[in-house]
Amino acid sequence: MKERIKAICLEKPNNVVVKEVPYPEKSDNDVLIQVESMGICGSDIGAYRGTNPLVTYPRILGHEIVGRVIESGIGMSDGVRVGDRVIVDPYVCCGQCYPCSIGRTNCCESLKVIGVHIDGGMQEVIRHPAHLLTKVPDNLPIHQLPLAEPLTIALHALHRTTLKSGEHIVIIGAGAIGLMAALAAVQYGAIPILVDILEQRLEYAKSLGIEHIVNPHKEDDIKRIKEITSGRMAEVVMEASGANISIKNTLHYASFAGRIALTGWPKTETPLPTNLITFKELNIYGSRTSKGEFEEALDMLATNKINASHIITKCIKFEEIPSFISDLSDHPENYLKINAVF
């Protein structure tokens, strides 16, 4: 066994390096996983910029992680064995608080997200709770598999709002999560309307079959959404950008008796016209991380309902992660999704 392994460590804001760290030690309830592939997430970029208040430094990054189980632990599901390829559920809950007691473990009062609150999976070998694993399908390339994690975030918002066939859903933000939410909405039989200020992302979404795209910088967004929905506005709105103005706009985009999922994380407080919440009797749902969506996400990728190659802009080597984190921070418009492999 190696005494030290390579890891991607964020020493402080704007300083991310490949460094050696001790080989992980596991408890009885943990597994050890030989990491094979990983995704770079927006939260990694926020940590790099120093804008994520939940991150402390130094921190090993990464929560979109796929690899092979090399040591078993108590609590592994019956279908997982040593040697199996798995994706990790990166949300570690206490199991004791009120949200955990009602099955809403993603709302745990002391939730620990790997790569954010505790060290993450961008390293050669990781220790992880044995019960937080899902076996992955055999028919997907290794570099595509980490995409299932951000897809669970998109699916969770659709589930929170109980999106139904035939409904319109406005999705604000045409990044990876917003685009996958739109593609998943099509699979649900719903009608997505994708809103963004980056025209190239909207045009790309249209090339993938998203018929309705709206750029508020180029047209009257309220008027256009009203036209698409025959005057009703959208029964469901998902906010996936975290921009304050976009959060405010959810109240205008939603129909009377509409439902809103807030998925994006704003950096500052957002003043809202709360009279609209009462006037329209809107249901507003926080949509944090995910809960129980990994199997559906993996199935969507494995059956090509969502084509991973349409989302992943670039696949890089592990050692290239620091330079691409820097470039992604400086030029986010150039990449939809970057995944890495060993």
From Swiss-Prot:
Binding of Zn(2+) 2, residues: 94, 97, 100, 108
Cofactor, how bound (note): Binds 2 Zn(2+) ions per subunit.
Chain sites annotated for binding Zn(2+) 1: 41, 63, 149
Tagged with keyword Oxidoreductase: yes
UniProt-listed Enzyme Commission number(s): 1.-.-.-
CDD domains, sorted: Zn_ADH7
Any one Gene Ontology molecular-function term assigned to this protein's record: metal ion binding
InterPro entries on file: ADH-like_C, ADH-like_N, GroES-like_sf, NAD(P)-bd_dom_sf, Zn_alcohol_dh
Alphabetical keyword list: Metal-binding, Oxidoreductase, Zinc
Keyword presence, Phosphoprotein: no
Similarity section: Belongs to the zinc-containing alcohol dehydrogenase family.
This protein's name: Uncharacterized zinc-type alcohol dehydrogenase-like protein HI_0053
Domain of life where this protein originates: Bacteria
Cofactor(s) annotated in UniProt: Zn(2+)
